[in-house]
């Protein structure tokens, strides 16, 4: 396929992350835009169109990330796409992965609440997925995010149906103040284990106040 120059809105870059999201040193590329409206959004600037840092092209991003090339090669690290919801920028990511050095690992921090076509586009490039599942209970998920989670679970089943992909998935199970309990988290974990998920990151959301976001 011919390499194409594509642009995408993004918030910024966080360099030299270690033991945060995959092996080696990684650099986070945070895109603007998200389908969810979480009550305790940890990166609410991704929802505000006035706070887009800038639009970047695939070649411009490559130039930015080549500054970290020695770290990636020395540690087996690479790029983590986050946001916001990075899978909404799957066309951009696909184009970027066609021009990046082959040695760079590609990871995703995602909610999986996107159309299947986005996953199909990025799966050939993905080394690891860090999936923020929120909660598998549909009522809890919708109350917290304002969205349904049917697509999330369907996409997770689809990923797990690919040979070897379960070894590259880490599901994040948050304790969300005022929204779920330890019993809810345990129930989610049991359901996900039954689906074939092997690796989990269970943690507490540390929040100061509820984020007021639009449901549009």
Describe each region flagged by the PLM.
Residues 7-40:
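N-terminal pre-triad scaffold of radical SAM enzymes
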Residues 156-184, 188:
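Conserved strand-turn element in the central/C-terminal portion of the radical SAM core barrel
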Residues 86, 112-119, 129-145, 178, ...:
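Conserved radical SAM core fold
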Residues 95-96, 122, 151-158, 184-191:
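A general structural detector for well-ordered alpha-helical segments in enzyme core domains, enriched
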Residues 8, 175-216:
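Radical SAM enzyme [4Fe-4S]-AdoMet core and its adjacent flexible, acidic
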Residues 120-136, 189-201:
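Structural recognition of alpha->loop->beta junctions
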Residues 11, 25, 43-125:
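Conserved Radical SAM active-site core
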Residues 27, 79, 106-108, 129-131, ...:
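Hydrophobic faces of well-ordered beta-strands that scaffold small-molecule active sites
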